[in-house]
Amino acid sequence: MLSIFGRATFAKATAPLGKALVSTGLTPDAVTLIGTAASIAAAVTLFPTGHLFWGTMVIWLFVMFDMLDGAMARARGGGTRYGAVLDATCDRVADGAIFGGLAWWAVYHEQSKPLFVATLVVLVTSQVISYAKARAEASGLSADGGLIERPDRLVIVLVGAGLTGIGGYWGIEWLIWAVHVAMWILAVLSIVTVAQRVLAVRSSPGAREILGASNSGTEQPS
């Protein structure tokens, strides 16, 4: 949802920053790698040790930094196919680290099985949501839309984790449950989004055509 309503505004707001970064000689791919590496480092060190607030702050900072690669690409006149693949791949790895770090905290620090289950569901479905779209597009079909995409997931999980961190520092009991609520909301919305994307593929033109034996569409192991 945020991807639809906020993309144009974000692109316009970050255009000057993109031009400034390009003038330094930094490349969009370098920004992608730096932002991803820093987000992963924060997720696997701060979240598992219970530093949810500071983990949220660091991850949010570098997620915003990582998003500047698009502004830089536009400032240079366009991106590359390699850059698009690198960005998408790094996003999946960063998401895995964020939800993996939270899952570790849920098990070994919070000792909450329900929170672990919700986080695990989100970890899996977040990858499936992105994969379904990529696989559909590779087959010439459409899997756009759905209730929740990556920007939505990041906002919900980071707000929840940040509020829980604040609740822990200040002893505000009800705030401590923020990440629990956030993860269950994400789990439900992510499952719905997976179903929406599969149905979108099913209703795409040509989706029900019978393929020949030599082009069965069976995915080969990678």
Predicted regions and their residues:
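Hydrophobic alpha-helical transmembrane segments
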Residues: 1-58, 63, 98-222
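Hydrophobic, well-structured mid-protein blocks that either form specific transmembrane helices
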Residues: 64-112
